[in-house]
Amino acid sequence: GRGYSERPRTKYDKNLYLETLRELILSQKINEKVHIVGYSMGGPIASYYAAEYPNEVTSVSLIAPAGFSKSLPQTKSWITMPVVGDWFWRVFSHRLYGVGNMSETQYSDDPLSINEDKFLPLFQDQLRFKGFNESLLSTIRNFNLFDVRDMYENLSKKEIPMLALWGKKDGIVPFSGSEEYQRIFDNGKLVVLEEGTHDITYRQPTIVGTEIIDFIDQL
């Protein structure tokens, strides 16, 4: 449903993403444990996988992970409504993306940073493919992006080494969620990017990449 992957007409729920990730890993014929990394919505997906297959996972690294919120945004209640939600999404989704896809970070001195003029065309290219809006709407309706703390609690019992990287100025997945992360994963590592926003993967990639590599190397 994202990037250049297929956009089947189906329910985009936890099971779909979990099964897709499972198929991908099996297709690579990996015969050892994996270090799994999830960004934003990928945080819960990676964590669901680790909770389901703990004996196959060495570590989990979360980048600005969704699912630690204590409250549900008002917008979601509108979008989940039949007919009204469909109409709203058809009419306004492109406009929302026109604003929402702008980087929160106006400047980055990271030499590997992807600038706005390069990022936006790549991001917006997805919108021209049939099924993108539908898959995104289905995800919002069927995948819990906001509060999956029960799943995280279950994962914490597996005693898998955990890392979370979070921008303190994240306007998409609030930094306040890091408090719940630390409560649930009391032995987990938290790296805070003081000036980081939600786009730390492509605006501060050097810091993010280095922290993940160092974390894995120490295991």
Question: Could you describe each region identified by the protein language model?
Answer:
Residues 71-73, 77, 91-157:
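Conserved alpha/beta-hydrolase catalytic His-Asp/Glu region
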